Structure formats: C-alpha cells, structure tokens
Amino acid sequence: MTNGAAFVDQLPKAELHIHIEGSLEPELMFALAARNGIRLAYDSVDALRRAYDFARLQDFLDLYYQGMSVLRTEQDFYDLAWAYLARVHAQNVRYVEMFFDPQGHTSRGIGFSVLADGLLRALADAERQLSVRGRLILCFLRHLDEADAERTLDEALAYKHGILGIGLDSSEVGHPPSKFKNVFRRARQEGFKLVAHAGEEGPPHYVWEALDLLGVDRIDHGNRSLEDPALVARLARDRMALTVCPLSNLRLCVVDDLRRHPLRRMLDSGLFVTVNSDDPAYFGGYLNENFRAVQSALDLDEAELRAVARNGFAASFMPDDEKEAALASFDSSLSPRS
C-alpha cells in the first residue's frame, strides 16, 4: 500500500460537478472587486476568509451571491475559470465539465456573451497550455420560474459549440424537477445532455422526477436516493451516474460526520458514483481534498479510489472516441511498470 495522499495525488481525475462561481477564492474576489471599483463588506482577505467558515446554508448563499457581484467583464470570467483550471491541473485533473449559472449574472445586467466568452476562452487556453480539457454545463436556477429558464436556453443556443449540457441547481426544497419539464424537453430536442441536482436536501421522489420527467443523463448529488430501495435498484440497473460532493455535504450539514457519508453505502449498493468538489473555495477543498477526505473517513482502499476516479471519465459526456482514449490513458497510467 502506498502512502494514501500520494496515491490520490497521482490518480488521473475528471471533475463533473464544479460550480465555477463557487471556486472564487478570497484573494481573487478582492482583486476583481478592486479592478471593478466594488467595495466589499470585508476589510481584508483574511476577514473574508474567516467569513468562509460559515455554519448555515444561508450564510453560504449570502457569500456566494456577493462573490458573483464582482464578476463584471469577460476578463473577470476568464480569470475565474483560469484560476480554477490552473489549480486543478496541479491536482492531476485531466477533464472538467464546468457548471455556470448565467441567470445569476444576466439578472445583474451582464450579457450572456460576456460570461460565456470568458469561460470558453479560459477552457480553450487550458486545453492548449495545460492539457486540461473541459466543457460547460449551463445550470438553471430552480428558485426562478420556467419562463426565465426558457429565455436563458434561447441565449445558449448560439453557444452549442461550447455548452455541452443543461443542468438544474440552487435551492432544491420546494422546487421539484417537474417545475422545469418543458424547458428540459426542449433542451433535449436541441441536443444538450441533461443533469439535475436532486436528492441532496430534496426527497427521493425528486430523483424519480429528474429521471422520468426531465430525462436526465446524470444525477447531481443523489444522497437521499438510499432512502428508497426501488430507486437504488433503478439507479444501479440503469448505471445512472451520481456526482457526489463529500466536503460540500459536510459543510452544508447534509451529513454531520464524513464517517456517515452515504458514499460507502452507494458503492456497496453497486451505484455508479463519482467524487467532486461542488463549490471548492467555500467548502474547504478541491478534488484531491475530497478524495483524501473520503479515503480517510470511509477507509476506501486503493482499488475503490481507483474505481471512483475512473468513473469520473466513464460518466463524462465526452464523445465516445475521446472517452475511450481517456479511459485507456487512465488504465495505462496506473498499470504496474516493469
């Protein structure tokens, strides 16, 4: 057995559940605020970092939306994405499907093209300079209405070359997937892959709705699926990927102790699970930190860690030929060397 942290570090990884706005570190938030003439409610980077030690969901959301307010120009969005991509490159992340929340910006008067162009330019530079490949997944904010989501989808159509999928995030409880069935149907017709946050705080039937009414290709979170044996059987039978976010679940009190995180039960139930960081700047860890956390808390062995990391590539929306090449590269990188 190699050193656990070293084993995690050398694993090639893909990240499928990362909200790019949630990667905004305090230093960059201050830099962008200064560049755009915005006064933050904190006197220093250290004071802001202390505020990141929140204990309630609302405290997180307040910080999250304040962070969004410093993003004004295409260069701001580029810098945000580039900072994340450079950081995860150092963690041996090879591929990313990056969530972004356009409604959180267009509602502030920021043009859709401003954010989309900045993010796509960063992804292109990361592929060329870092060999980190990535695509965008546009997420609708579920606390807004479906008509607003429809308008956002209209704006996304000009960016189908760079936006791979459509997702659903924000406050889950009280906003079931069924609220968005029409816009998801249209997104599917337009050729987008589909994902949705479901079963994090919301009940298991939200996962059923995401599967049967939205027709998603992947479930984001899905923790509470374990409360419904029939749902677990369905997820296992269909090999439906779940993008699990351990440190996020801990910080938002979805679980009170990582030793009781459902990832272990998911694996034991034969579910197709990936590990991800969600909003890493706010939740205390990027992808490697999430892997190390569950390795320690759940006593995952190297074979399990390897399988979960491989799942990240297998569950991705890469074209089949790219996926086959990525999986072959993953397997060869971990083969014993003579």
Tell me the role of every PLM-derived stretch:
Residues M1-F192, E201-Y206, L213, D217-R218, ...:
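Metal-cofactor-binding active-site regions of metalloenzymes
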Residues H197:
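Short HxH-centered metal-ligating active-site micro-motif
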